[in-house]
């Protein structure tokens, strides 16, 4: 059942990275934030 907890952790990590991606996208469309963010190109 280690595999089951690995699956849960992977799902949590996917959700966390989705949230980061949404936050970065929102920041990059907002000029005062985009200017400060190295993640916006």
UniProtKB/Swiss-Prot annotation:
Subcellular location: Secreted
UniProt remark on domains: The cysteine framework is I (CC-C-C). Alpha4/6 pattern.
Disulfide bonds, paired cysteine numbers: 27-33, 28-40
Name of the protein in its database record: Conotoxin Bu22
Tissue/organ expression: Expressed by the venom duct.
Family: Belongs to the conotoxin A superfamily.
Secreted keyword on record: yes
UniProt propeptide residues: 1-25
